[in-house]
Amino acid sequence: MKKTSSRYLAGSLAAHGSILVFALMGLEVIIMISPFAFFFYSVFSPIFNFLNHYPATAWLTTFFLPHMILPPTLGLRVIRIAGSVLFLAGALTFLICALQVYLGKIFKWGLARHGLYRFIRHPQYLALAMWGIGMAILWPRFIVLVFLSIMFVLYYYLSRDEERRMLARYPESYSAYMASTGMFFPRIKAQRSAVQPGHLLSSPWRHAVIPILTVAVVLSTGFLLREVTLKSLPFETEGNLSMISILPEDNPLVGTIVQAIAANKTDTTLAFLKSEKDYLGYVMPPDYVMQGMIANTGSDFHLFKQHNTVAMISDWVLHPFEHLRRSPAAHMAKMHNVEPTVARRHHCPLGKNDASLDCSICPYRRVILVEVDGNGGQRLTGSATLSISAPRIPVGFVDINAATGEIIESQRVGTATAWAGIPTPAI
């Protein structure tokens, strides 16, 4: 009995430890826009930088779904909405089930057989899985998927061990309960089908096959989603310049913008563009909220300094697309009870605080340009500029009138983003 208890304790610690690490990796997005970003990255930046430094591990820090680009297709938008739904539903379900179990222990209600426990034996673990999948969609780094798959495996074995202990303690009642419920999903068949000899679950190889298969399926899904994402992005290319818009409504403007910049790249104001290098340009509103993840364009876009973390996180979860269209001034306006349109004009990065201007139809756009290293002189265009193996270094930004092609201002930037050397999203 002691051996069984020790084994369960070890399994429980491993499983809960995995979800703690997963939560830290997944909730990085919350921490990175909070005043605690410095403390978090003082611990984890060496890990991220180490992984990002080697081609064999650089994929772990990259993203498999759009995070700062508004999803361009219906399928990707549905996935993004599902992320918010699963994140919230999983968290709420877990809290309800946890209350049911722990109140049952306090008041000695016996086995939990009501609510979701009437249909499945481990709704808490199912809820954690839902929350985890939602978190992985909301903050889609590959390293989050790795820990998510490990969490799946550990909680599967922890569930089986819990069932063995319950059968030993309540052989008749728990056996009947198992016959009428599913492990993680409601049972469809009335009779519990026995595992046949030779089946994977009865094979001695199962302890190796199940973890490997789980990790492989989860990561393969991530790579598939990344490929679908890259193929859905509408690039415009002119010479060594490839461009993409952050917002889909700006897609018609990209062709004019890339041609205007290509025609002026020999100008001294665009001296940061070299003919022998390849560049990826992100087209966005001048006050686009997440531009600090691409380049350090000024303290207004250092989100960890804005002191409105809760509002931004709520917006990110509850408004999957509109949060990308809101400027940093919008949240500050709400905090100080100021008209958002007035605040947006007042904080316009181009200094165009004109009451007659309507920011919603503003013709000006900012283009942040990053240099893409082709590794060995290979020229990269289109989706190849987002290759996992291609380093991307910020070089400058251009403010342009998208209607006329007139360049208003250009500025060189440092080689780091607003988060210094931390690998940030490229999509």
Predicted regions and their residues:
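Membrane-anchoring alpha-helices and their flanking helix-loop junctions
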Residues: M1-R113, W131-A426
